[in-house]
């Protein structure tokens, strides 16, 4: 793909952010399309046939997500849908569908299964693009060390 767009709104936004964070370490051109970044359609304005949209939608399905997927599909992008059921609205629109259960035991959405699926995807893609991923993390480790991004106190890690 020329560019990878990752879309998740409302509670699915945290999932999209997680996937975008790691895909940015693996791929050159990743766009996290989300409410925090501005208007959805403006962020996806240039999506086209050489691009992929990974759309994440769980109950209660966001209309804005579905409308953005419709737009991307009209522009010829390949749609990968991550949702909870083959009967979910996103499943009917996607070229490829990955399923993960989402339970709503209370007013809080349980995103444990979707997060596990995304973790597996990130690891699998990272292994497939092992050389690029290794180079990226070697560069990042140098930057993190030079700019003290992470705590270096070893006592923190050895505490009981």
Segments from the language model and where they lie:
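Glycine-rich phosphate-binding loops that contact phosphosugars or nucleotide phosphates
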Residues: 2-116, 122-127
């Amino acid at each position: 793909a020329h560019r990878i767009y990752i879309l998740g709104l409302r509670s699915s936004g945290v999932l999209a952010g997680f996937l975008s964070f790691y895909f940015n370490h693996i791929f050159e051109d990743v766009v996290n399309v989300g409410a925090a970044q501005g208007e959805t359609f403006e962020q996806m304005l240039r999506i086209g046939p050489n691009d992929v949209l990974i759309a994440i939608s769980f109950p209660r399905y966001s209309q804005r997500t579905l409308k953005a997927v419709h737009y991307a599909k009209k522009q010829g992008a390949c749609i990968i849908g991550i949702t909870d059921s083959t009967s979910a609205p996103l499943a009917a629109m996607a070229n490829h569908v990955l399923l993960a259960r989402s339970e709503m035991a209370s007013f809080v959405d349980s995103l444990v299964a979707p997060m596990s699926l995304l973790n597996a995807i990130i690891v699998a893609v990272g292994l497939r693009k092992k050389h690029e991923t290794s180079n990226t993390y070697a560069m990042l480790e140098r930057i993190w060390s030079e700019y003290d991004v992470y705590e270096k106190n070893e006592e923190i890690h050895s505490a009981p």
